[in-house]
Amino acid sequence: MISSLSFLVLVPCALAQQAPWGRADIPVSSHDRVYAADQTSNTVSVIDPANNKLLGVIRLGDPVPGALSPLYKGQLLVHGLGHSPDSKILAVVSVGSNSVTLIDTSTNKVKGTIYVGRSPHEAFFTPDGRELWITVRGENYVSVIDPALMKEMRRIQMADGPGMTAFGPDGRYGFVCSSFNPELAVVDVASHRIVKRLPQASPFCPNIAVTPENDEVWITLKDTGRVQVYSATPPFEQRALLETGPITNHINFANNRNGKFAYVTIGGINVVKAFRRGAAPQLVATIPVGDLPHGIWPSGDGSRIYVAFENGGAAAAIDTLTNKVVAEIPIGQTTQALVYVPNAVPNGQGTENLSPLGEAGNSAHLHLESAGTSFPDAQASVSVNSLGLLDLVEIAAEGLAPAVQYDVYITDSNRPPFGKREPLAILKTNADGAGIVQVIGPLKVLAASGSAAPTSSPQRFLIVTNRDDASQIVLRQTSASSNQ
């Protein structure tokens, strides 16, 4: 069910500005593309938003575990995305191979790859398109790339663990949040100097965006389930601190005749929340979506918001006038970032150099429910992603105790006494009582009721226990599973 309040403020469509460049509306067409960064399959999924169909994937590497070979030369952990203001270049950040790959959007062809420091996270072009800033989260700097030369030109020193950069549409300031330190840096773009350091309400910011009117900066705080809002102009004061929910992931904006809105993906409870922007941001809709929503981006006219499901193997289109999901599209595995690029393909079909989804489309989706009275609202989504002979299982839990370790087991039954237990993983929760863990192994038995499972193997189940007291079961798998 969608909970919403009445939309009372009307804004003429002709005056609308859209993120990220603050431009006037560009109607949705078959020239546009939606791109999703698929971290496990090491692909970029390519969607035509005119009909909400998957066109194929750009393969940048092999799936895990093949990508872990010492002789492997492809990209690893495809994660972050950015696009040039002229829509001609897609920048793809691969965390594991320390790289950013530039792709021609009209042909889906790789133009080249630039290698940077340890564990880069996200990429963003300056509004004039002359520079590409990469946050090198595994170190302490932003790598400034000349996209024409495909070469690093300079580094901007930051606090340890810069998470993401966003620019105001006027190009004067860049804003860099941190994933390891409670600090947001304001950078003068022309001089590449930090002009202000602002306090973050908590250390882990994975995502940041500037409003298309260039008046506010919004950041997500994944560790505490909040969104922090600042002024985008001096003195850059804090304007709001919003309680949003566990595993608050990404944020973006859409303007339409109903008003100006911010959309936030809340991974722990599988919703997108819409806030009316203003002096006191107001929650106006809570939109149920697929498992572990992550990346989010508006269409060029703000009529839709696209969101990727990290544990769902799909992306969804949301109508921003009704705040209802109008389409779901299959994509690759454990998707992180998503971007919408208007007029990415000015001419032709734009399907060159694409491959079918293939094995990456073979996944199952499970649910864990509370198994006792200690945490009655606890739950988790689980994806079982086929990697061929092996599988990657990702568990995203919420509603547990904060900053605690739990044991994950495979069992013979999902009911007491659960039968034989085999240890699978350790789940660590953050300050908000939420946590995500991944494990690789021959785990299709978790989805024995679905097409991904071997027919000769009985189904096994997942339970989560208190690490200090293994008899305390906090989560157990329900019987049902869904498959793609």
What spans do the regions from the language model cover?
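Bacterial N-terminal signal peptides
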Residues: 2-14
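Predominantly soluble domains enriched in secretory-pathway, periplasmic, or organellar proteins
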Residues: 13-378, 388, 402, 419-423, ...
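Structural beta-strand segments of beta-rich domains
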Residues: 389-395
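Short, flexible loop/turn segments at beta-strand junctions in immunoglobulin-like
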Residues: 397-400
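Short beta-strand segments enriched for Tyr within beta-sheet-rich domains
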Residues: 404-410
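Extended, polar beta-sheet/loop recognition surfaces of beta-rich domains
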Residues: 412-457
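Internal, hydrophobic beta-strand segments that form the core of beta-sheet-rich folds
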Residues: 454-469
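Short beta-strand elements
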Residues: 470-484
